[in-house]
Regions:
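Short, compositionally biased pre-sequence/patch detector
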Residues: 2-4
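Structural detector for short beta-strands of small beta-barrel domains
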Residues: 6-46, 108-127
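Beta-strand/loop nucleic-acid-binding surfaces
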Residues: 47-72, 135-164
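OB-fold/S1-family single-stranded nucleic acid-binding modules
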Residues: 83-112, 171-194
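Extended, positively charged loop/linker patches that create polyanion-binding surfaces
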Residues: 95-150
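C-terminal interaction module
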Residues: 132-149, 161-193
Length: 194
């Protein structure tokens, strides 16, 4: 994959007010499934662990839910937004942290993802791209992370140069856990050079 050295992700804009949502970094995965609970034994105690069970998602993906929200909804179908992570093969992985509950009118779009980040690499041969999502000043994210995504060749060829800000959206292939980009557009980011 081609790549360029990105600016320091720990830099924050000096002398600026709160960030507009249109320039923040973010990544969100929308899923609809059943609220479930399993028991976790830790230091002799049994703790409930609430999660969203989504049919067809890889077994290696765990969609955590907040106990206060999930406990009264055990067994119900709900939609939720999580912070996605992928491995180097562009497959969803690991323990995904919840962001927020989805209103029912948004459920029909799931499984769906969207993000705003900095294009880190493009591999035309493999049909993949990488996007870096960085912490926003005053945000909860403490360290940048990179998502590896699949995309059609025509979309990859149309992307701007590595280092550019992009907004991407696409779908989750449930059986394989792949995130496939279907649409992109240029995006301004808070740490863009002036």
């Amino acid at each position: 994959m081609s790549s360029a050295a990105p600016p320091d992700p720990t830099q924050t804009p000096e002398g600026k007010g709160p960030l507009s949502k249109e320039v923040t970094y973010y990544a969100a995965l929308w899923s609809v499934g059943q609220v479930r609970v399993r028991e976790l034994k830790k230091k002799g105690k049994v703790l409930p662990l609430y999660y969203l069970e989504v049919p067809g998602y890889p077994r290696s993906v765990f969609l955590a839910l907040p106990q206060s929200f999930a406990q009264p909804r055990l067994g119900q179908t709900i939609g939720f937004s999580h912070a996605p992570r992928t491995d180097e093969r562009a497959v969803l992985k690991g323990h995904l942290y919840y962001i927020r509950h989805l209103e029912p009118h948004l459920w029909e779009r799931a499984p769906y993802f969207h993000l705003r980040g900095r294009l880190a690499a493009v591999d035309l041969e493999e049909g993949r791209l990488q996007v870096e999502v960085r912490p926003n000043p005053g945000g909860k994210l403490r360290a940048p992370f990179t998502l590896t995504l699949w995309a059609p060749l025509s979309l990859l060829e149309a992307l701007p140069p590595v280092g550019s800000g992009v907004y991407l959206e696409g779908e989750v292939r449930p059986r394989s856990g792949r995130l496939v980009v279907r649409r992109w557009e240029p995006a301004r980011l808070w740490d863009d050079p002036q």
